Swiss-Prot record:
<feature type="region of interest" description="Disordered">
    <location>
        <begin position="1"/>
        <end position="71"/>
    </location>
</feature>
<comment type="subunit">
    <text>Interacts with GIF1.</text>
</comment>
<dbReference type="InterPro" id="IPR014978">
    <property type="entry name" value="Gln-Leu-Gln_QLQ"/>
</dbReference>
<feature type="short sequence motif" description="Bipartite nuclear localization signal">
    <location>
        <begin position="184"/>
        <end position="194"/>
    </location>
</feature>
<dbReference type="GO" id="GO:0005524">
    <property type="term" value="F:ATP binding"/>
</dbReference>
<dbReference type="InterPro" id="IPR031137">
    <property type="entry name" value="GRF"/>
</dbReference>
<dbReference type="GO" id="GO:0006351">
    <property type="term" value="P:DNA-templated transcription"/>
</dbReference>
<feature type="compositionally biased region" description="Basic and acidic residues">
    <location>
        <begin position="47"/>
        <end position="69"/>
    </location>
</feature>
<feature type="domain" description="WRC">
    <location>
        <begin position="179"/>
        <end position="223"/>
    </location>
</feature>
<dbReference type="InterPro" id="IPR014977">
    <property type="entry name" value="WRC_dom"/>
</dbReference>
<dbReference type="Pfam" id="PF08879">
    <property type="entry name" value="WRC"/>
</dbReference>
<dbReference type="GO" id="GO:0048366">
    <property type="term" value="P:leaf development"/>
</dbReference>
<feature type="region of interest" description="Disordered">
    <location>
        <begin position="217"/>
        <end position="269"/>
    </location>
</feature>
<feature type="short sequence motif" description="Bipartite nuclear localization signal">
    <location>
        <begin position="212"/>
        <end position="216"/>
    </location>
</feature>
<dbReference type="GO" id="GO:0008283">
    <property type="term" value="P:cell population proliferation"/>
</dbReference>
<feature type="compositionally biased region" description="Basic and acidic residues">
    <location>
        <begin position="243"/>
        <end position="253"/>
    </location>
</feature>
<comment type="function">
    <text>Involved in the regulation of cell proliferation in developing shoots and leaves. Does not possess transactivation activity.</text>
</comment>
Length: 269
């Protein structure tokens, strides 16, 4: 038994005596697990290449679409572009620097720098500044609160700023609610009707309603004696007419009574 085993596998025992036989021995077959792993790696590589190709195709289509959108959106007329004034840009930059310095000067944990009302007023003033920087007329509803805050701070405010920067020509009443339609006559019937005419400069009413409701002076005319049409004589002088009127007024009421009572006495007799 031992002899047969040695004959079948001569390399098992004393294999070191025959080196040529060791070189001719076949290599061991690879395991099944390694083969499956290599196949999985190859499959994943192919899937990655396919995904990459699909992405490139989609990216090319997206770039085409983006190019079309850019052609539609980014094309601007050079004549319409506004040219920024360097002075305004410098003023805006200086204002931003001042605000940053003010915010940086507030210590940590000191609380809010402004109250809610102050923040609201600051926002409103920034809107007014935006209109002024754009060289556009500032709306009146933004100017009125600022004017009221300035005039209400002291009794001299209304004297220093009585016309609100030249808006007195709009016939606006700064003591009450703002006028919704400046420049229109204020004459109304107390309900819904309102005059549609324009006002006189620096006034509240139009020419028709300017003197409405005021007492007008009564003009006194002296009536001269009527000339006789038949005789064609000239009318008497105004001096003579006044003298005759004075003589008529000088008659006492007693004489008038006697003149009226005389016929009654004659009838009784």
């Amino acid at each position: 038994m031992t002899a047969e085993g040695e004959a079948k596998n001569p390399s098992a025992g004393g294999g070191g005596d025959n080196p040529q036989h060791q070189q001719a021995a076949p290599a061991p077959a690879p395991a099944q697990g390694e083969v499956a792993q290599e196949a999985a790696v190859q499959g994943t590589g192919q899937e990655q290449e396919r995904d990459k190709a699909d992405r490139e195709v989609q990216g090319g289509a997206g770039e085409k679409d983006d190019g079309a959108c850019r052609d539609l959106v980014l094309v601007e007329d050079p004549e319409v572009l506004a040219v920024e004034d360097p002075e305004e840009a410098a003023a805006t930059a200086a204002l931003q620097e001042e605000m940053k310095a003010l915010v940086a000067s507030i210590p940590d944990g000191a609380g809010a720098a402004f109250t809610a009302m102050q923040l609201q007023e600051l926002e409103q003033q920034s809107r007014v500044y935006q209109y002024m920087a754009a060289r556009v007329p500032v709306p009146t509803h933004l100017v009125f609160p600022v004017w009221k805050s300035v005039t209400g701070a002291s009794s001299e405010g209304a004297q220093k700023y009585p016309t609100l920067m030249g808006l007195a020509t709009l016939c606006l009443d700064f003591g009450k609610n703002p006028e919704p339609e400046p420049g229109r006559c204020r004459r109304t019937d107390g309900k819904k009707w309102r005059c549609w005419r324009n006002t006189i400069p620096n006034e509240k009413y139009c020419e028709r309603h300017m003197h409405r409701g005021r007492k007008r002076p009564v003009q006194v005319f002296l009536e001269d004696d009527e000339p006789d049409s038949a005789s064609g004589s000239k009318p008497a002088a105004p001096g003579k007419a006044t003298e005759g009127a004075k003589k008529a007024d000088d008659k006492s009421p007693s004489s008038k009574k006697l003149a009226v009572a005389a016929p009654a006495a004659v009838q009784s007799t």
